[in-house]
Amino acid sequence: MKPLQSRIKRADYGIDAPTVVRNFFLIGISGCIVGTILAKFGSGRLPNWLVSFYGACLGIGGCFVLQGLIMIWGSKVGKQRLRDKMIDSVSWRGDEQVLDVGCGHGLMLIGAAKRLTTGQALGIDIWQQEDQASNSSRATQENALREGVADRVELRDSDARQLPFLDESFDVVLSSFAIHNIYDTVGREKAIREIHRVLKPGGQLVLADIRHTSQYADILRSLGWNQVTRWLPNFLFITPTRVVRAAKPNTRS
């Protein structure tokens, strides 16, 4: 009989941008197949100029497959390492009220909940399948159970542009790879302004994204935040990922 720990399923934090990953593999494998066919069977049957493209097909196909593998590594390994760095950058007491904007499968949410004793971690999302494979509140709750923090986690269906919370409700706001999914500039600004509204004076914000982080930082500075930094980029998902780390001024706005 297997030990109890080995029988308990590990938390599954999903594959980010599953359609993109699928397309990388489809294009890559197709290119490799075409290149192989041209190399093995094309000589004498097809024009030489066409056969000469076999190397390009194999090279391009291999690059797309590699990008798909990097995306999977980013989802399964890289983003968990980044999560740990982001969580470690927060000064925790244990009694914080935490909000995770666009929590998905709960990677940031659960990481924060593990740092809490009497506090509570609340995650909001609209659960879009194109953002993460099998994205649902049920999957997130299951992950919280597997990680032993279900009693410190709460989930709600909500749009980042209109958060259903009172002003100055949270000590810490987290977000990872979510706000770029709001495609218009005005909508992203609304989301950042909502984060500003619900965060307490002196509260901490840590936000990771693959695009628009300079816009987020500029909006925060325009709202009077003077402790705003952007970390150096990393390449978890091909496109550079940057983290915005900021603290809301203690003066009430």
Where are these regions (language model features)?
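A short acidic, Gly/Pro-enriched loop at the edge of an enzyme's catalytic core
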Residues: 93, 161-173
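Conserved beta-strand signature within the Rossmann-like core of class I S-adenosyl-L-methionine
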Residues: 202-209
